[in-house]
Regions:
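Alpha-helical tetratricopeptide repeat
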Residues: 1-110
Length: 110
């Protein structure tokens, strides 16, 4: 049932994007749905579009961190969280994620 709802949500956000392709939040919402569906590359493509429209979009930057973590691109994920922290320095989640990812990078280098 959840898959059907995600498919429907993706379709609706696609319709919204077709109506207004310059609305960053529509791209960001579809990126979120695609991430939840496990379609990480497609999610990243939508995030790229969001960041072309609004380079300081906090949600897209943190979402990119999640996508890159899922793809095991830990350094790219860290870079995304660094940018998110610059945009929203009082939000703690990017710092927490950066610390966790630094540990993953250290494990990889052993």
């Amino acid at each position: 049932m959840m898959d059907n709802k995600l498919d429907a949500a993706c379709d609706k956000f696609t319709e919204v994007i077709e109506l207004d392709p310059n609305w960053a939040e529509a791209w960001n919402k579809r990126a979120t749905v695609l991430y939840l569906m496990g379609k990480y590359e497609l999610s990243q493509a939508d995030i790229d579009k969001v960041l072309m429209i609004e380079k300081r979009h906090f949600g897209a930057l943190t979402g990119q961190g999640l996508v890159q973590t899922a793809l095991k691109n830990y350094q790219k994920a860290i870079d995304s969280y660094v940018e998110a922290h610059k945009v929203h320095p009082f939000m703690k989640s990017p710092m927490i994620m950066m610390e966790k990812l630094q540990i993953e990078l250290q494990k990889q280098s052993i």
